[in-house]
């Protein structure tokens, strides 16, 4: 299994994303899933080494992820990784969780899924596995036939986990764009919002692991 598929497999289920940061619960599992691939070792260095704190800050302020990436890269090198290996560790995280510039889809797995009725319905187009949203995709929600919400994210077994680019239609008239990070369908940390010429943050529950 490739490293991206392995990470998403590890994140399946209740608190899967959070448990990924727990070495007792996840340590060695990526190596097992990937057959001992070097990428698994690099990713675990990001999760469990000096860069861990910068990674958590990045999750809680995803709009400014590039700033935290610079810090994390330096901390990975302090842990003994080369500049190229440190860059690769971050690329793996960005790809697994759909950050801008890292959203390539496997076209062989792209499909459309619909759900709901005339009062509320959803349309999903993106990567699908075993009949569920799994991978990069976009979902549009409709209220009585009119769009009301849009999410572009990474889905893991039907649940959003990753960098979120969303749009809301508030009061049936005002479009609000939101950029942040989602864990188990819940926005975490600071979500950057744009409404007309206004910019502001919505503060959600911070993601934190010991």
Task: Pin down the residues of each PLM region.
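Charged, amphipathic alpha-helical regulatory modules used
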Residues: 1-106
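Glycine/tyrosine- and acidic-biased, solvent-exposed loop/turn segments at the edges of beta-strands
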Residues: 105-210
């Amino acid at each position: 299994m490739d490293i991206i598929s392995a990470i998403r497999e590890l994140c399946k289920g209740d608190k899967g994303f959070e448990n990924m940061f727990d070495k007792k619960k996840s340590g060695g599992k990526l190596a097992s899933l990937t057959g001992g691939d070097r990428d698994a070792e690099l990713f675990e260095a990001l999760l469990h080494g000096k860069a861990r704190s910068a990674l958590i800050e990045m999750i809680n302020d995803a709009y400014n992820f590039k700033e935290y990436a610079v810090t994390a890269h330096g901390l990975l090198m302090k842990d003994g990784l080369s500049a190229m290996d440190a860059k690769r560790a971050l690329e793996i995280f960005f790809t697994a969780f759909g950050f801008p510039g890292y959203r390539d889809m496997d076209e062989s797995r792209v499909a459309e899924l619909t759900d709901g009725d005339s009062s509320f319905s959803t349309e999903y187009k993106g990567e699908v596995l075993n009949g569920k949203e799994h991978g990069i995709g976009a979902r549009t929600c409709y209220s009585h036939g009119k769009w009301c919400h849009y999410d572009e994210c990474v889905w893991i077994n039907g649940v959003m986990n990753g960098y979120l680019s969303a749009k809301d239609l508030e009061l049936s008239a005002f479009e609000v764009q939101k950029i942040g990070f989602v864990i188990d369908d819940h926005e975490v940390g600071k979500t950057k919002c744009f409404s007309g010429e206004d910019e502001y943050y919505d503060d959600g529950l911070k993601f934190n692991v010991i």
